Amino acid sequence: MSNLFKKAAVFTDLHLGYKQNSQLFLNDCDRFMDWFLNLVKTEECDTVLFLGDFHDTRNSLNINTMDHSIRILDRLNNLGLRVLFIPGNHDLYHKDRRTVTSIRYIEKFKNIELIMDQHTEGDVTFVPWLIGEEYKNMRKIKSKYVMGHFELPSFLMNARVEMPDHGGLKADDLNGVDTVFTGHFHKRQIKGNVHYIGNAFPHNYADAWDDERGAMILQWGADPVYHNWTSAPRYRTLNLIQMLESPEEHLDDRTYARVQLDVSISYEEANFIKEEMQKTYGVRELSLIQHRGEVLTENAIGDVAFESVDQIVLSQISNLDTQHYDTRLLMEIYNSL
């Protein structure tokens, strides 16, 4: 049996349409693809693999987002290489079956293949987002590599939250293979034979200070090599003194920053700081968080609006990506406290 590839470029969890179909986020996706396609060519890869969550919203697809999606697929197709996609949970309309997906039109591209069910080829097994009790079949896999979109307990969902064990698939169920590469959790992490390769780029403040995102190059039989996209958006949480001492180190036109006020300042001073940081460094977002629980956040240069810390917490809850937590219920519980 011949190997599926000699050298593969692997990426995951692009989430086109995130941030309510933000144009800036879509532009970041386009910039990522510029970098990724150059990496594919530089590394002389013969295969491209995508491990799920091409789109973000599972029940609708914005026209502008779809336009960017098709353009990205067209660029991948034009590589002239074999490109294989599996759907993640965000790509599926139903939670209990894989019959409807927002990436079905991938099949119209000559060089791109959509793998909707477990499939083994060339000693590689592809496993899309698992449904129901499909996880029970994972122990039977004996391939050298598994490429999947798994939700495994004891791994970090983000830098702060570990996935609890709710039953279902466990890492031990995949011990029959040499190495597992998976999407779903966005933080790059390795434990045993399981590699969460990390998503394309940081998406929100759950990714603060965690810039190890980008893509993986896998030469058959060799250790994977991870490449960071150094021009990615970045999220920072820091205090005011820290920011003012070395703003050039922390702020640029790719930065989203939440700044804790560790000294007392007036609204006028806050306006001045925000205006100067925006003018000098072009930061995308700068929120000043006061100890008493108010947030000074920028709507326009020179204006200070208020946002509650509660909104920040609720935003973090809504960003949890797992089928085992009911985020609406968590938000209701938090609001009742």
Predicted regions and their residues:
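Accessory, non-catalytic peripheral segments of nucleic-acid enzymes
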Residues: 3, 42, 219-337
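Active-site environment of divalent metal-dependent phosphoester hydrolases
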Residues: 15-19, 56-59, 85-96, 132-134, ...
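Core catalytic region of metal-dependent phosphoesterases/phosphodiesterases
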Residues: 4-5, 14, 18-118, 173-177
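Structural motif
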Residues: 6-8, 47, 122-123, 145, ...
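Divalent metal-coordination and catalytic microenvironments
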Residues: 13, 33, 48, 53, ...
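Short, conserved loop/helix-junction motifs that constitute active-site signature segments
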Residues: 76-79, 139-142, 171-176, 250-252, ...
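Conserved catalytic scaffold of divalent metal-dependent phosphoesterases
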Residues: 69, 87-172, 197-200, 221
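Conserved beta-sheet core of the metallophosphoesterase superfamily
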Residues: 159-223
